[in-house]
Amino acid sequence: MHAIVVAVPTDAEITFADHAGRLYARRYGMAPVVGRLLGYLAICDPREQSIAELAEALLASRSAIAGAVKTLEQLGLVRRSRAAGERMDRVGIDLTSRRALGFDPTEYQEQAALAREGLAILADAPPERRAVLLEWTAMAEWLVARLPEWEKDWQAHREALRAAGELPGDTTHSDSEEAR
């Protein structure tokens, strides 16, 4: 087993993580530590770090980091991994899932189903009362229909960027995934 050296974050890296924390708190109502963690994981070296290393780098408690990891895992944005012989998990950004990239249609399928449930309740109501649910259903179904095409467009665009040298090779896998 070999030790992994983790660099102390620079002021600029911590500022970036703080900016991510504010963005995710303001935009998505998440606890600032969730955004700070995601921002830091986007720039840290190595790309995967333990809960303790992340807590030390972000000057946060281990329990706050563990809670933020749980939130980001539920969103499909991070993944825990453990190298052979290690006793602790390492956390890194995971861009391998459709959900992490924003192309998972299930969120919108569930929204459409919920809106249709509301429409069934309001089956005899005037169109004005049903308007919000009708538009909600239409928008969700429209997104479900388009997401597969947008995902293919993104994959083609990403490959073009890689071919042009504007994106490095495969950035979708974590360090431990690459080692497998």
Predicted region positions:
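Amphipathic alpha-helical dimerization/coiled-coil segments
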Residues: 98-144
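Glycine-centered, phosphate/nucleic-acid-interacting loop/turn motifs that mediate DNA/RNA or nucleotide
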Residues: 76
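Short helix-capping/hinge SLiMs at alpha-helix to coil transitions
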Residues: 27-28, 42-47
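N-terminal leader segment of winged-helix/HTH proteins
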Residues: 1-28
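A short acidic, leucine-rich amphipathic alpha-helix
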Residues: 53-56
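Short, cationic-aromatic polyanion-contact patches
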Residues: 28, 33, 83-104
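Short coil turns linking two alpha-helices in DNA-binding domains
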Residues: 61-62
